[in-house]
Structure formats: structure tokens, C-alpha cells
């Protein structure tokens, strides 16, 4: 799923983003990222932009849960375009031929602005690091000024190599760090 997901994110970037303002970033499994960077200080989104996480509406019709508010037209257009692109994508056709479910479209939710966080070391006088396979937690770690330690075999799922994560944490804490956060799901 990660490989196909990355391919589909790249497909979206190539076919749907006609400006430098939009940037898709592949993540782990369904956890991908779409960034909008305003070049003129104005964004199409505001506090009234409303999106719904897909896991909150399982087994429901999506019509009443599509993005609403400022910028919703842009988000809905991307979602509709993804449906068209994914239907024709060879990787999805191979999944269907193998009796597997295809990726049918992107579902955009969880919008917000990156917070401006004071570095943890500056605020509390201690240095830290994080070990995680989850991009959201990596991002929070970076915003806090922590080292983000990449561990081979860390997947963000139950098949994670916990032993390797533990060894990496012990090695890291043996250095200059005051603490380490190891994310286990």
C-alpha cells in the first residue's frame, strides 16, 4: 500500500497542481500530506473551512460530509479529479485484477496552520528526540527542535520492529540527549 500510495500522490502532484502553491507529500499508508503555501499572503482557506475525517463516517454516504466553507470548492475539485485519475491508474487496475480493492480517491481532512512552537531546549533547558514512523509526530518533533531518529523497520503498525526501535532509543539516550520519546502504536 505504501508504494501504490506514493505513486498516487505523485500522480496527483503531476496532474492536479498547476502552481507552486500546492504540494503533495507521500507519507505512510493513508497518511499523506497536501500543503498549500500562499505566495501573496492570502489563502483560500479560513477558520470556517470544515472537513471530516473519513474514519468518522464509515458506512455513511459521503455527500453530506464533503468539505465546506472557504476553499471547499478547491478541495472538492481535487477529490473529484483524484477519482478520475485513480480509476485509470495501472497500479489500481492491477489490484482489481488481483481481486484487491483499489484506491478510489483522496479524502482531504485535518487542515490547519503549522504552529510556531518555541524550541523545547530553549523553553525547558533539556534536549530530546523522537522515534516514530508517523509523519505527524515527526513533524511535531521537528517543530519542537527534537532530533527525529529514523529507524529501519519502524512502520507505524503492529509489524514494527520494536526491538530495533528499543535499541535505537538506548543508543540515542546514551549520547547527549536528556530524553527520548518512542512512539508505539
Residue spans for each PLM region:
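Feature captures the catalytic ectodomains and active-site-proximal regions of enzymes
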Residues: 1-185
Amino acid at each position: 500500500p505504501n508504494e501504490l500510495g506514493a505513486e498516487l500522490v505523485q500522480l496527483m502532484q503531476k496532474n492536479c497542481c498547476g502552481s507552486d502553491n500546492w504540494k503533495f507529500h507521500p507519507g505512510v499508508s493513508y497518511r499523506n500530506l497536501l500543503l498549500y503555501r500562499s505566495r501573496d499572503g492570502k489563502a483560500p482557506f479560513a477558520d470556517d473551512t470544515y472537513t471530516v475525517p473519513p474514519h468518522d463516517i464509515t458506512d455513511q454516504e459521503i455527500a453530506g460530509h464533503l468539505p465546506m466553507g472557504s476553499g471547499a470548492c478547491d478541495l472538492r475539485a481535487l477529490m473529484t479529479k483524484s477519482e478520475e485519475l485513480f480509476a485509470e491508474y495501472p497500479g489500481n487496475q492491477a489490484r482489481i485484477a488481483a481481486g484487491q480493492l483499489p484506491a478510489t480517491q483522496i479524502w482531504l481532512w485535518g487542515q490547519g496552520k503549522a504552529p510556531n512552537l518555541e524550541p523545547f531546549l530553549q523553553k525547558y533547558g533539556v534536549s530530546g528526540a523522537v522515534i516514530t514512523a508517523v509523519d505527524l509526530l515527526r513533524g511535531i518533533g521537528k517543530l519542537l527542535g527534537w532530533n527525529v531518529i529514523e529507524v529501519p523497520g519502524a512502520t507505524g503498525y503492529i509489524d514494527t520492529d520494536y526491538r530495533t526501535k528499543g535499541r535505537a532509543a538506548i543508543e540515542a539516550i546514551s549520547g547527549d540527549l536528556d530524553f527520548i520519546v518512542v512512539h508505539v502504536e
